[in-house]
Amino acid sequence: MQFSTVALFAVAAAFVSADVVTEVDTQSTLVTITDCDSTVTDCPARQTEAPVSSAPVSSSAAANTTVAGVSTYEGAAAKGQYAAGVAALAAGALLAL
């Protein structure tokens, strides 16, 4: 009885966490161009104009009163795996009786 309960918990935990993926970027390199050869016609280091921004600019701090919408509906919770894990645990509890 105890082995089946432990096995059921292990299977349920593995099922719930099966969709969790962790990625680590180990290949990115940041390069800043500070100077170019005189033959380069479009050198970013010689740029005299400010970059064009498509975002509206406001000079008043009070004008920006909108709150960013943040969603917590993502990852494993969005796929219903927690519900499947709970169902598996409930089934195991019924079998243990």
UniProtKB/Swiss-Prot annotation:
Places the protein is found: Secreted, Cell wall; Membrane
The organism's place on the tree of life at top rank: Eukaryota
Keyword annotations: Cell wall, Glycoprotein, GPI-anchor, Lipoprotein, Membrane, Secreted, Signal
Transmembrane intervals: none
Residue ranges listed under propeptide: 76-97
Broad class of where this protein is predominantly found: secreted
Disulphide bonds in the chain: none
PTMs per UniProt: The GPI-anchor is attached to the protein in the endoplasmic reticulum and serves to target the protein to the cell surface. There, the glucosamine-inositol phospholipid moiety is cleaved off and the GPI-modified mannoprotein is covalently attached via its lipidless GPI glycan remnant to the 1,6-beta-glucan of the outer cell wall layer.
Lipid addition sites, GPI-anchor amidated glycine: G75
Glycosylation sites: N64
Topology with respect to the bilayer: Lipid-anchor; GPI-anchor
N-terminal signal peptide: 1-18
One annotated Gene Ontology cellular component of this protein: extracellular region
Family: Belongs to the TOS6 family.
Protein name: Protein TOS6
Organism: Debaryomyces hansenii (strain ATCC 36239 / CBS 767 / BCRC 21394 / JCM 1990 / NBRC 0083 / IGC 2968)
